[in-house]
């Protein structure tokens, strides 16, 4: 157990909206090539994972990884605290790593580093 979190279980379906789960949480984990502040979160992914998490009485955790740093937000907790994601329509690539020329409008919001738990995995000894 790291940080008191029970063992993570990988989602069985490769097309699942979340990546891992444990007794208390659903996790979506993204590895990024750049660090941002704010980070972007898609409203559809947020809504889907919040709905799933609530249906199984868990919290939804969103993690962005960049060069060994984890930026972690408890989205369920932020919603309970009336966090303003500032959702708006934004033109984005249809898919992250494939055809970058095809774009689509997506509803996106923001997550700020000041609202994240930031973990340096390179200097942490569990």
Where are these regions (language model features)?
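Mg2+/Mn2+-dependent nuclease catalytic core
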Residues: 31-55
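Short glycine-/polar-rich loops that comprise or flank the Walker A/P-loop
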Residues: 56-60
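Short beta-strand
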Residues: 9-13, 62-64
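Non-catalytic C-terminal interaction segments of nucleic acid-processing enzymes
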Residues: 2, 55, 66-126
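Conserved catalytic cores of phosphodiester-cleaving nucleases, focusing on short active-site segments
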Residues: 20-35
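Acidic-basic catalytic patches of nuclease active cores, encompassing PD-(D/E)XK
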Residues: 1-11
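Beta-rich catalytic cores
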Residues: 16
